[in-house]
């Protein structure tokens, strides 16, 4: 089974989209549609419905690894694998999916520490113009090293980041004082600042201080940029554990 899951669409404090895969070695024959939408581990952990604008696709994968490697996807412009799907014995059932969630939503502002806990080096005071340039939209002529001239353009990034929405995706470059387009900046008590490591821990749904093991702040930020939003594997694990309990009782 696989789902492409945006953590924020299930109430978590970060907009982070990743593929989550669950597999069994010796599973009984599945009802593919039921497995995808109802009985599957991921369907129970993260409910979905099919996006009605697109059809559900069925196709088969060649069982011979050599043939599959050389022939799969030839002539296909868009991947046959969609947002969610199941596969068993080479048979694939997949679709574009819409999340089903009606619970509470956590946002960036929920994870901020008090301003008194923020070290002075996290406040932005001297190089504000650099931050404004990098965060802003732009369309400008640039010249490559080989002399080729081109127009570089990009849209603006929220500056500061909205506190009433889940954070953007945390990247490995979140640490360090230098201005950056991708780092988060929040406004607190009228002052702009970067996120501290304890906040990054919590945006990945680790306990506050999880990475406070003696590492530098930059290394802590790097670790969180490489992490998953842990609420997702936790919910998948809860379903797996419940199934294991049922199997043992039988």
Residue ranges and their predicted role:
Residues 89-250:
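C-terminal target-recognition/interaction regions appended to catalytic cores
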Residues 1-162:
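Class I S-adenosyl-L-methionine
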